[in-house]
C-alpha cells in the first residue's frame, strides 16, 4: 500500500510539472528574429522550453518570484531580458552567469530588498539597467556597477525605502547617457557620491524634500549636462551661499517637473541658477506656483539675473491664485537675452506690451493651448514688440478672424513662420494683410471650407490639412511644400499654379485617381504622399502605378497606404498587388469587337435570309403560330366541303370549267370550296384559308408552274401539311396539271417536295381518252 501511494504521488508531480511546462509554452509567442513575448501570462517561473536562439525575452507582469542559477543558463545569446512587475524576491548569485551578451536588463518593480554585485559581474555587455521600485534601502554593501563598463542608462531607487546614497554606490561609472535616481525619501547623502561619475548627459532626480538638494547639486555641476528635478516641494527652499562649490558648471539645461514653488522660493531658485554659468535652457513642466508673481524676495533684493539662459519653457503651469497674479513687471529686465519662449497650456490670455518690447532677442514664441483672442493679441503685438521674432505659434487658442490676425501681426517685420492651427475660423476673407517676410503658415484643423487670396503669396510652406476643403486653386508661385491631407479634394491641385512645389502631402482625401500626365506636370516635385484615398483601380491607373519604377521614390507612403476602393472585388487590396482581367482592361476593344461580330452576324443572317427566303419562312411561321392559336378542328358535323381546291389564279380556267363541272355535276355531286366563290368577304385571307381547309374533308392541290410561283398557294400547301401532321390524317391530294421537275421547285417549297416524295399524285392526261379515268380516280380519292 505505501508503495502504491508513493507511485501515485510521483505520477501527480510529473503530471503537474508537464501541465506547467505546457502552460508556460502556451503563454509565449516567439518570432523568427528570436523575440519572445510572454508578458501578462501568469507564469510562475522562467520557461525552460526555449532554445538558445532567443535574443529578446519579455516576461513582465507575471508571477515569477525566484530566479535560480539554471533558469537562464541556456540563453547564451540573450540580448534583452524584461522581468518588470513580477514578484521576484530572490535571485541566486550565478543566475546571470551565461548572459555575457545581455545589453538590456529590467528588474524594476519587484521585491528585491538586497542587491548583489555578483549578479552583474558577468554582464560585460550591459548598456541598460533598471532597478527602480524595489524595496532596498541602499545599493548594496559593495559597488554594484564597477564591472559594467558599457553601461549607459541606469535607473535606481524607490519612493519609500531608499534612504541612503553612499560614495561607493556609483564607483566605476565614468559616463552615462541617462541616470535616474528615485530618492523620494532620501535621508542621507555622502558627499561626492555622484561626483565619481565624470559625465552624465541627463540626470533625473526624484526628491520629495529639498533638504539634501544643495549637497547633491554641488556634486553635479561639473558632470551633468541636463539636470531634471521631479516631484519636489520647494515651497520652503532657501539657497545658502555656503553650499556653492564649483563655478565651472557643465549644466546647460535645468528642468523642474511636478515641482511646487512660491514667489519667495522661486527667487531662491534664481539664486541657485545664477551659480550655473553655462545654463542655456530652463524648463518648468506640470509645476504649481503658489504665489502672485512677485519675485523680488522678502528682503527686497533685486531679481537675480539667470545669466545666459536663452530658452524658457513652461508647460501646464498651475497657479491657484491666477486671478490675483501680477503683471510680471519685475522680470522684464531679465528677458532681453531670451531667444526662445514656450508657454503652453497655462491660461495665458495676454502678453503685456511692455514685456513684448523687452523681449528684444526673442526669435521663437510658442503660446499654444492658451486663451489668446484677437483683441489681446493686438496689445501683445504692439508697436516695437518682439522686434526679432521669426516664429510665432498660437495653436489652439480662441482666435476667430484671419483678417484681424494678419493686420495685427504687421508690426512683426521679421516674422516668417506662423502657426495658428486648431483655432476656429470657418470663413476666410478674400484679401488679408500679412508681414512681408512670411514663409510658413499653418492653418490645419481650423474648419475652413475654402481658401482665397487671403493666403500670402510669399509662402514657401503651407499647411491646411484636416479642414473641409474640396478645391484648391490658389496661385502660390514660391510655394515649395503643401500639406493638404484630410480634406475633401477629388483631384490633385493644378501644377501650373504651384511651379516651385517640392513636397505635396494630400493623403486621406477623396481622390480616386491620378495620372502620369498630372505628376509630370509638377516639374520640381520630389515627394508625394497620397495614400489613404479612395482609389478606383482602373487599368490605366494600375498600369501607371505598377510600371513606373521611379514612382516609388516619389510616393513616400507607397505601397502600404494605397488601397483600392473599387471595383468591389478588389476593394481593400493594395494597388501594387491588384491584377485585372483582359476583359476589364480592354473593355472598349472587347465591346467594339463584339459589335463588329454582331454586325457581321446580322449581315450574314440577312444574306442567308435573302438567299434561302428567310423572310418568307418567318411569315409562314407567323401564320402557322396564328393558326395554332385557333381552336382545334371542328367535329365532323361541321365539315362543309368535300374538298378545298388550292390552285393558281392562272389555272382558274381548268379548275372552274373542267374540274368544278366534273365534280359538282356528278351524281351525287361533290361540294368544292373555291377561294373566288366561297371565301368570306372582309375576313383576313389567312383566316379564310385556315377555315376553308379545316371545314373541308380533303385539300386538292392543282400543281403547275404557276402554283409554285404563287405565295398564297404556298400558304394553302403548308396549312394542309400542318393539318396532316397535327391530325395524322391523309387530307392532301396532289393533281399534277403539267409536268414539273422536282429540281425546278424552289427550295422554299420544301413541303411540296416532301409531299411529292412521300405521296402518290394524280397527273392530268393530255389524251382525252384517259381523262375519264383521271376523274374517276380523283372522285375516289376525295371520297376516301
Curated annotation (Swiss-Prot):
Main location: membrane
Disulfide bonds: 30-36, 353-382, 432-454
An example Gene Ontology molecular-function term: triacyl lipopeptide binding
UniProt topological domain (Extracellular) ranges: 21-587
Record topological domains on the Cytoplasmic side: 609-784
Domain TIR as annotated: residue spans: 639-782
Covalent crosslink: Glycyl lysine isopeptide (Lys-Gly) (interchain with G-Cter in ubiquitin): 754
Domain notes: Ester-bound lipid substrates are bound through a crevice formed between the LRR 11 and LRR 12.
Known partners and oligomeric status: Interacts with LY96, TLR1 and TLR6 (via extracellular domain). TLR2 seems to exist in heterodimers with either TLR1 or TLR6 before stimulation by the ligand. The heterodimers form bigger oligomers in response to their corresponding ligands as well as further heterotypic associations with other receptors such as CD14 and/or CD36. Binds MYD88 (via TIR domain). Interacts with TICAM1. Interacts with CNPY3. Interacts with ATG16L1. Interacts with PPP1R11. Interacts with TICAM2. Interacts with TIRAP.
Biological function: Cooperates with LY96 to mediate the innate immune response to bacterial lipoproteins and other microbial cell wall components. Cooperates with TLR1 or TLR6 to mediate the innate immune response to bacterial lipoproteins or lipopeptides. Acts via MYD88 and TRAF6, leading to NF-kappa-B activation, cytokine secretion and the inflammatory response. May also promote apoptosis in response to lipoproteins.
Protein name (record): Toll-like receptor 2
Organism, scientific name: Macaca mulatta
Gene responsible for this protein: TLR2
